[in-house]
């Protein structure tokens, strides 16, 4: 924990990915401490899928964790995590200024959304690239790539309703 805080003090990070293991290190307490000092840095827990880890995570305080993902061996999950966080940060401005659409994925199963999000992002990015090729110049191409639908993940019904109401006019 002290080592991570020292690194954060000396360097600029835009994302923290923690991987829990079954030793005595408490990444959840460390995440809470990091969030106190660096509240704007997203913290993601990337965990192997197992019953033991799932039970442990179910009993942890996840208030400092932005997302929990299950590592299923698909490297595209890392891109999906980055894009999901970018979408979370950019959606309010992009929907208000450019009218970007929102895709709302509602799912409470970590294992399922860890599997589905990489496929969803791959599809959306491929569609955006095809759409951008139709642009007349570089500026239009850039605007069309930025204008791809943003994906929002809701893990509870209440979160889904809140996101829906926030972006209902898009």
Task: List PLM regions with ranges.
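Conserved acidic segment of CheY-like receiver
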Residues: 1, 16, 100-111, 116, ...
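Output/docking surface of receiver
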Residues: 1, 44-112, 153-155
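Conserved phosphotransfer microenvironments
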Residues: 1-5, 13-40, 47-58, 65, ...
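Short, well-ordered amphipathic alpha-helices
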Residues: 30-31, 81-87, 116-128, 160
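Short, flexible coil/linker segments at domain boundaries that flank nucleotide/cofactor-interacting
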Residues: 38, 98-99, 146
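Short, conserved catalytic or adaptor-binding loops enriched in Gly and charged residues
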Residues: 58-63, 139-146
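Alpha-helix termini
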Residues: 88-94, 124-143, 167-168
């Amino acid at each position: 924990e002290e080592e991570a805080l020292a690194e954060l003090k000396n360097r600029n990070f835009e994302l923290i990915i923690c991987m829990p293991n079954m030793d005595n290190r408490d990444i959840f307490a460390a995440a809470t401490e990091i969030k106190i000092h660096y509240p704007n840095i997203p913290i993601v827990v990337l965990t192997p899928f197992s019953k033991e880890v799932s039970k442990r995570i179910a009993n942890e305080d996840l208030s400092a964790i932005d997302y929990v993902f299950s590592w299923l061996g698909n490297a595209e999950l890392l891109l999906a995590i980055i894009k999901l966080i970018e979408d979370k940060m950019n959606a309010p401005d992009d929907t208000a200024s450019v009218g970007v659409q929102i895709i709302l994925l509602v799912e409470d199963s970590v294992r399922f959304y860890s599997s589905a999000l990489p496929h969803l992002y791959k599809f959306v990015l491929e569609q955006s690239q095809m759409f951008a090729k139709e642009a007349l110049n570089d500026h239009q191409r850039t605007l069309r790539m930025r204008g791809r639908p943003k994906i929002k993940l809701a893990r509870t019904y209440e979160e889904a309703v809140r996101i829906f109401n926030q972006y209902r006019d898009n």
